[in-house]
């Protein structure tokens, strides 16, 4: 057993209001520059829909993730090394700019410079940020399907409608929608790492964040195909691939990611998970796709187990990280309460951004007699959002974990309603789903009224373990822009150090 730590995230889809604040703040911080105008490290999609880029869940088209061969070994869906090499100069499975959208801005200056005597009102016309030319029509955007925008024929192409009678959902009274915020999953078994010909993508040992070395990247773009979530983008200006970096400078300082910090609905939770690195290959190679969710749970370790703590210390895990794992909201939701579920585990990448499935307005529907009752609780299989749709999205089609999560959230609500409204303790619903009163109270606290320090339990990094500090002693101190050699010469052979240096030692003339 080789223990490693990973900073994971849980998003509570039951509280997401689709405001796109996370997307905008992430965009402003990381991709508001030339070359990545079309890139959104974080975006919020409305489901059902084809998403961004278009039809990203269709792996028959894009060949992302892993497949299990007959001999039980894993191989990238896009092929082995020889097949990858054969496509290196012409990759047929790469999404084009039209699968994303042509980024644009508006000629706002025209509103100021238009002549006064014009018979028509001046307008700000769209202009392409790629060609610089005016666009006759905006064909697409990063959230083109927002709030079920578009006809049902296009929404019905959503891959999560597989094994569902989707024709009935084209009728207005049967429509449903939910928001799905997406970012890089920072997988335990990332396919992008395996498909990069340059070896530029790596997974950090201390926190599990997957990064692209910009010095090694050669722009082959195989990683874009290899990533089944299509969360790697090609910077056409620099010729490099870029992706969500999980705001690692903030994570190293013990702070949450930008998207988590600015989330209006407070739906995001960050925490540390300890896992057995030796068990990853065995879990990802599970034969039945529906078993992948449980196999990934088996990879995670109990941070309160004395044997796990002892082995973690031997493997170099700092004590502060172990303590953070013991308080991790991600561990509680994924492992203890089993409310959070992984996004498309059938891709076999073992994703580390998990989701709490959304509840439809089930109680009001039950009170109106539109839903049947299954004991104490309303029948969750009659939800407006089909359970099979959620299962296709979160558990490779297995409805049992989804039903368990929905019933537990519903039981918690039933218990708290009886406590706060009726003034009595009713544990029948909790007993039905296998929860204790203490667990129900804790679930309520985390999902409804959690404080900042409860939602984000992120230990600061230990730089002293990453780099020896002693050789830096008596190194480069303060200089006047002349490097570390201590001279104050005005000349430099390469004219690099002193080009912008300010001569602060010269005397200034007194003012008259």
Positions of the model-derived regions?
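Non-ligating segments of multi-cofactor redox enzymes
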Residues: 1-512
